[in-house]
From Swiss-Prot:
It is a multi-pass membrane protein. The gene is GET1. This is Golgi to ER traffic protein 1. It is found in: Endoplasmic reticulum membrane; Golgi apparatus membrane. GO terms for cellular component: endoplasmic reticulum membrane; GET complex; Golgi membrane. Its main location: endoplasmic reticulum. Component of the Golgi to ER traffic (GET) complex, which is composed of GET1, GET2 and GET3. Within the complex, GET1 and GET2 form a heterotetramer which is stabilized by phosphatidylinositol binding and which binds to the GET3 homodimer. Belongs to the WRB/GET1 family.
Length: 229
């Protein structure tokens, strides 16, 4: 707490810092945490291979290539005609399969560590700074509104939670910035979203009865007297 108090951040610094953190938070939510973790994993594989950090992945790739080559060779011979050779290849394939599985488990553990690291970094970038701002700088006035710009009741709302009328604190500023950034992202991405089909209004279809059928049903039955006699 002494370190934070010693900083004594200027209101302008708080405005810019909170805006930056909220922008990063909105971008992370827009892109998706899982997508960022996947990009970080691919970056780790690309850079880690050159720096010797992702040895498990490199070894896994080589072992898989050897296993595919061995399986092709095993399928190319007959187990009955060349039983000894086929048995030897089969033992090698089983050994390589076990090694590939072990390396796959190591890669899964490495990926889990990368995902956890990305989660911690995102936490420090997007969540902890906001809590620090709310706890230690909640009583800081960021700026003052010119007199008469807004009605009195609007100034009182903007002064929430406990500032004088005409003041704007961190709570209202962060709420406004969050909504503005969210609206801007929506407007920028809305044209690229898939179009929604126009709903078709369902109309009641009445059954049309032919006129001949109507006349037959409505006309009385005529009995031929001559035929009856």
């Amino acid at each position: 707490m002494g370190i934070l108090a010693a900083l004594d951040l200027h209101p302008y610094t708080l405005v810019v810092s909170s805006f930056t953190v909220l922008l990063i938070q909105q971008l992370v939510g827009f892109i998706g945490k899982s997508t960022i973790q996947e990009f970080a994993w691919l970056f780790y594989l690309r850079v880690g291979g050159k720096l010797g950090l992702s040895n498990s992945f490199v070894a896994h790739t080589k072992k898989q290539e050897e296993l595919h080559k061995l399986n092709r060779e095993k399928r190319s011979i007959s187990a009955q005609d060349e039983y000894a050779k086929w048995t030897k290849l089969n033992r090698q394939a089983e050994k390589l399969t076990a090694e590939v599985k072990s390396l796959s488990d190591d890669i899964a553990k490495d990926k889990s560590k990368i995902n956890s690291l990305v989660g911690v970094v995102l936490l420090f970038l997007t969540t902890l700074p906001l809590w620090v701002f709310r706890l230690w700088f909640r009583k800081s006035v960021l700026f003052y509104l010119p007199t008469g710009v807004f009605p009195y009741y609007v100034e009182r709302v903007l002064a929430i939670p406990f500032f004088a009328s005409g003041s704007v604190g961190l709570t209202v500023w962060m709420f406004a910035v969050n909504n503005v950034i969210s609206s801007v992202l929506f407007l920028l991405t809305f044209p690229f979203k898939p179009s929604v089909p126009i709903p078709i209004r369902q109309t009641k279809v009445e059954e049309v009865v032919p006129e001949s059928a109507e006349s037959k049903e409505s006309s009385p039955e005529v009995i031929d007297i001559a035929d009856a006699n």
